[in-house]
């Protein structure tokens, strides 16, 4: 199969850094944080435009810190503990429990009756290892994206 993209690690890091503000903005909106793209640019550049609530600033800071953590630890192995650390970075400063750990209660998704399993009902180590052992890197990336 011909690959549409054949980017090096350095290419991917460059692309991620170029798209970081857009990624933070879109993640924030997905989570219901009411910010504009311009607000996100200002926040990322440490400009307080007075339009973002303190609560939303903490949420944006968590997203920014998580991206910085990922970019600064790019050579670390992807493990369950690494994923938990990213969760910690995203949620620190917010009222999220347990912070940096798997949830212990059920959750719902607006607009659907589907409920994900509790983490205690899953074998995340095995699931992650199965995905990471896929020899097709593009398939691995797609499956990992959907799994996380």
Enumerate the language-model features and the residues they cover.
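FIC/Doc superfamily catalytic core
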Residues: 1-148
């Amino acid at each position: 199969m011909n690959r549409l993209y054949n980017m090096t690690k350095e290419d991917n890091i460059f692309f991620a850094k170029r798209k970081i503000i857009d990624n933070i903005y879109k993640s924030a909106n997905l989570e219901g944080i009411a910010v504009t793209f311009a607000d996100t640019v200002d926040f990322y550049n440490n400009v307080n435009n007075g339009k973002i609530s303190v609560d939303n600033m903490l949420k944006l800071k968590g997203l920014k810190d998580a991206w910085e953590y990922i970019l600064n630890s790019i050579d670390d192995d992807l493990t369950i503990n690494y994923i938990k650390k990213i969760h910690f970075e995203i949620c620190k400063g917010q009222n999220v429990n347990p912070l940096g750990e798997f949830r212990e209660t059920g959750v719902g998704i607006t607009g659907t009756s589907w409920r994900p399993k509790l983490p205690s009902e899953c074998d995340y180590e095995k699931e992650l290892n199965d995905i990471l052992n896929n020899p097709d890197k593009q398939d691995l990336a797609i499956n990992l994206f959907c799994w996380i």
